[in-house]
């Protein structure tokens, strides 16, 4: 049913706003509510004045599973630049939803990236997606635990965009008075630098 608010009783809520106006001359807004898994998805086609839930916690068929118990860790949503009725949702993998009917809004989901495939596959995107940004040429950049992936055809094909940098995500860091530093990293173990390696920038796993 339509209402004026997206329920706030969720550990995490991600919002997205369309870059263009829809056929009613309003911006479309989307909200994805999660705990460890999907709670609900909501849409507004009138600049946020009213909202309609189009997916509940039970979700679509059982093969649909975006978050796989990680909904508070990885969740992101974006509206495609040229279609206010189509969104991409990032969790473990990237999924697409497109509205196909109105009153109430309803549509279908399609998985458009696959973490389980070989990294050489054009459908491969690393797991745990955290950020999505479009550029002026409608290329989508997705930031995840493996770095950055990009698509220039709305998810039909994906390419790695990791060039010339070494990064990791730290959850905790400690250091001593002499400048030695240790950190616990996502998927990269515990890294330590006591300035005894060939450069001061080098860390070793301990």
Question: Positions of the model-derived regions?
Answer:
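Beta-propeller blade termini and top-face loops
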Residues: 1-206
